[in-house]
Amino acid sequence: MVKGIDQFKAHFEAFNDRYVLIGGAACFLVLDEAGLDFRATKDLDIVLCVEALDAKFAKAFWAFVERGKYKNTQKSTGKKLFYRFFDPEDAAFPYMLELFSRIPDVLKLSDDAHLTPIPVDEDLSSLSAILLDDGYYDFIHDSKIDINGIPTVPPEIIVPLKARAWLDLTKKRDAGEKVDRNDIKKHKNDIFRLFQIVEPDKRISLPKVIKGDMESFLEAVSVDPPPTLKPFGLGGTKFDEVVELLRKIYDLRI
């Protein structure tokens, strides 16, 4: 389940062209639609569509933050344009909102709003770097679908996003940066869960950079494959079969 997603959906019903949900919330939506369970997730990863943003959306967003009485409101500094809001007083609201934008100061502050810088020693979302790349940004928005009134992306699109997030976190860990091993593991495990509902006859043409990332991901995870895929609903499926089919779906090297 995704705490507060119904509140979010109702509040932003008139702004479905301004954003797309990715990450764990997107996994929940596509798996739930297929009648499958997904791990609990407490945050909403929101990609803003800069071409459609306006003052009305910014006003509506700040109204949502104020209604939920979020205790912590943060903004990244520098190149990564990232907003984080968490720990609302109203328990009916999502615990955390993480917004990704490609233009600075997209959320004009309300008169009494204050954004503190995200601490340097706190890593930004593993999905934040994705939006700095034109290929990923267009890939997400060109693939947008609607599930129960919420704009998101289908499972075959979430898989490459999760693969890139896994690669980024793994690279940081290998460079000696502090990374929660569970954050790395969840992205890989989510891909196996999503595999249950990816249509085997799908064929996805990936932009060059995303294709390269998928290649790198499959090569890396093949070095240390899980002993069983049963926890992900794939008890009768071998790891090599998953890799082979993903290569076919995304037109990768066999």
Where are these regions (language model features)?
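Compositionally biased terminal segments of proteins
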Residues: 1-254
